[in-house]
Structures are given as structure tokens and as C-alpha cells.
UniProtKB/Swiss-Prot annotation:
Biased composition, class Pro residues, residue ranges: 77-89
Region (Disordered): 1-104, 213-244
Native species: Caenorhabditis elegans
Protein name (Swiss-Prot/TrEMBL): Uncharacterized protein F44E2.3
Record-linked InterPro entries: ARGLU1
Any single Pfam family the record assigns to this protein: ARGLU
């Protein structure tokens, strides 16, 4: 009876140990899977960093597409590659694709396909760049046109302002010139009047002097005649002697 009870008491312990071993095995399997995943990712990153090769999953998809196309068309020129054996595992796109395993026709087709896709992508990028350049050029032309129009509007406003100021100044100068011309005309008229008055005065003075000289001459003649009349005879002219 005591032996049975001891065997029952050891049973849960064995169960715990067995569960622990199973958990350890599961952890080991998970660690191995993690290591494999990390190694696969590392290989994938190293293969994707090469600039001269295409992406592995793209090459694999291109190869499968070509294989299906060959199977459908059954072209006699390029025989399709042999199908993989049934025991092969499914293709993992994360593993780098080895081009050296393909035959020459498939390699040639694959190269043409890659060149075709690269050329199409290049043409697409060139078209996008040309469209962007055209859009940028149109936008630049629009901005320049608006800037030039604004500058021309400012220049036109300044020209109008300067023209208005010039017209005002010309009017002022014309008015000043007319005023000075009138003043000069008045001065000329006054000078002419003064000159005529002076000429008239000069003529009057000359007439007065001539009249005075005539009167003086007449008076002298009268005096001489009176002297002659008193004496009755003519006598010698009186001589005047100056000095001793």
C-alpha cells in the first residue's frame, strides 16, 4: 500500500520533467528557425545590394512566367526548360536566384526581358522628367511674366508721373516767359517814348537856340543902326584894346 502511494506521488514530477523537456525542445527549434530566418534575410540583403543584378523574387517570377509561356506556346525554336521534379520544395522568393542554372535560350530571353523592362522604366522616367521640366518651365515663365508686367506697370506709373510733372513745369515756364516778354515789350515801349521825348526836347532846344541867336543878331543890327542914325555919319569902327 505504501509502495503504490509512492509511485503515485512520483507521477506528477515525471510529468513536469517531460513537459520541461518538450518546452526545451520547442525553444531549441524556435532558436534554429530564428537563426535560419536571420541567415536568409542576411543573404537576401547582400544579394539585393548588388547593382548589376535584378531582384531575386522578380527574376524568379520572370522565370516562372517564361516557363508558363513556353509551355502554352510550345515553340519549336526555344524548347521549354524541363519541369522540376515533384519532390522539389516550393520556390522561396527570399532566397537569391542563381542565373547560372538556366540554359542559354532562357538566359537570352531573361536578358531581353530585363533590358525591355529597364528601357520601359527609363522611358517612363524620361517622360516624367520631361513633364516636370515642362511644368516647371511653364511655372517659371508665368512667374517671370507676372514679375515683368508688375515692373512695367510700376515703370509706366513713374513715366506718367514724370510726364505730368514735366507738363506742369513747361506750363510754368511758358507763363514766366510770356510775363517776361510782356515786361520787355513794355520796357521797349517806354524806352521808345522816352527817346522820342528826348528827341523832341532836343529839337525844341535847337529851335530855341536858333531863335535866340537870331534875336541876338537882330538886336545887334538894331543897335548899330541906332548908332549910325545918331551920328549921321559913319565913323570908324571902334577898336578895343586889351592889356596895357
Amino acid at each position: 500500500m505504501s509502495r503504490r502511494s509512492r509511485s503515485r506521488s512520483r507521477s506528477p514530477k515525471r510529468d513536469r520533467e517531460e513537459r520541461k523537456r518538450r518546452e526545451d525542445r520547442d525553444r531549441d527549434r524556435e532558436r534554429k528557425r530564428d537563426r535560419k530566418d536571420r541567415e536568409r534575410k542576411r543573404r537576401h540583403r547582400s544579394s539585393s545590394s548588388e547593382g548589376s543584378q535584378a531582384e531575386p523574387h522578380q527574376l524568379g517570377s520572370i522565370f516562372r512566367e517564361e516557363r508558363r509561356r513556353r509551355e502554352r506556346n510550345e515553340s519549336p525554336k526555344l524548347p521549354p526548360p524541363p519541369p522540376p521534379p515533384p519532390s522539389d520544395p516550393p520556390v522561396d522568393t527570399s532566397i537569391p536566384f542563381d542565373v547560372s542554372t538556366l540554359n542559354e535560350p532562357t538566359k537570352k530571353w531573361l536578358e531581353e526581358k530585363i533590358v525591355e523592362q529597364v528601357s520601359a522604366r527609363v522611358h517612363q522616367l524620361e517622360a516624367m522628367m520631361a513633364e516636370k521640366a515642362t511644368s516647371a518651365r511653364n511655372e517659371m515663365e508665368k512667374m517671370l511674366r507676372a514679375q515683368i508686367e508688375a515692373e512695367m506697370a510700376v515703370e509706366l506709373a513713374e513715366c506718367k508721373k514724370r510726364d505730368e510733372e514735366s507738363r506742369k513745369k513747361c506750363k510754368q515756364l511758358e507763363a514766366e516767359l510770356e510775363r517776361k516778354v510782356l515786361e520787355a515789350e513794355e520796357s521797349r515801349k517806354k524806352f521808345e517814348e522816352d527817346r522820342l521825348a528826348m528827341l523832341e526836347q532836343k529839337s525844341q532846344l535847337e529851335r530855341d537856340r536858333a531863335e535866340l541867336a537870331r534875336q541876338k543878331s537882330d538886336m545887334k543890327k538894331n543897335e548899330q543902326q541906332a548908332i549910325l542914325n545918331k551920328s549921321g555919319n559913319s565913323r570908324a569902327p571902334i577898336k578895343f584894346k586889351f592889356g596895357k
